[in-house]
């Protein structure tokens, strides 16, 4: 699956379950293992699990490989490995403590968050 399509699929899956503070980092210059790291915050263990399930389910439906899902038992930090894209779903305290944004560095990739606006309905002519 194309990287841009997989990245969009992940963002949409995270937004469907109300993931917060989504950041995407280009890691092609830092690692040969994956091209993107996506960080997202969740407000509870239940939400971290729901976000991970949403990402894994939508990836499978689209034909992408889900290589691994780790951390669901504890639920404070869940990692979903999709090969080219690695998703870290974290509660805010864990995210602040580990500061992965500093590790993956620099500026996040600019992506449009949220669904595109629906076209305005036109009144029917009768």
What residue spans do the PLM features occupy?
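Long, contiguous binding/interaction regions
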Residues: 1-29, 43-50, 57, 70-71, ...
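A short, glycine/Asx- and small/polar-enriched loop/turn
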Residues: 32-35, 81-84
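Short glycine-rich or small-residue beta-strand-to-loop segments that form or flank ligand, phosphate
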Residues: 36-42
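Active-site phosphate-binding and catalytic loops of NTP-dependent enzymes
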Residues: 61-69
